[in-house]
């Protein structure tokens, strides 16, 4: 259980840093470039933000794999098969709080699932706020 708790804190910190750096990179690099039209900068914001979310989902999927296979902290039931795609699918479903329920955690790994859902909620909210701020900057006609 201590290993799962440590993994939760580690992934929470990593995801926060990844998102912070990506949004900072987008803000400062877009402000300095005149080569991209104003409204097109919003497409870059959306794609960059999605890339950050995808990276975070991938990190959580890898952590599920390691926690299950290396540390034996639980397993998955339901429609789960032993492919990385299943880990990615479950991670994306959890991160976005979609929660179909076709795959479910068993054991100590459940705590990790809750932290991923909370992390996804906060990061998606952060992206929405950032996108709004960038829209107020770039969407209006000059």
Q: What is the meaning of each model-derived region?
A:
Residues 10-15, 84-91, 97-141:
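Pore domain of cation channels
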Residues 55-89:
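Outer-pore turret/helix-boundary of cation channels
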């Amino acid at each position: 259980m201590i290993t799962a708790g440590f993994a939760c804190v580690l992934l929470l910190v990593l995801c926060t840093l990844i998102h912070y750096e990506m949004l900072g990179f987008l803000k400062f690099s877009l402000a300095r470039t005149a080569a991209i039209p104003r409204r097109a900068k919003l497409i870059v914001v959306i794609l960059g933000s999605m890339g950050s979310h995808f990276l975070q989902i991938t990190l959580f999927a890898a952590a599920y794999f390691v926690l299950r296979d290396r540390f034996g902290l639980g397993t998955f039931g339901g429609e789960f098969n032993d492919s990385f795609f299943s880990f990615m699918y479950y991670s994306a479903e959890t991160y976005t709080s979609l929660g179909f329920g076709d795959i479910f955690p068993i054991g100590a790994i459940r705590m990790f699932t809750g932290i991923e859902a909370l992390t996804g909620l906060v990061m998606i909210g952060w992206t929405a706020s950032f996108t709004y701020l960038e829209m107020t900057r770039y969407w209006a006609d000059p």
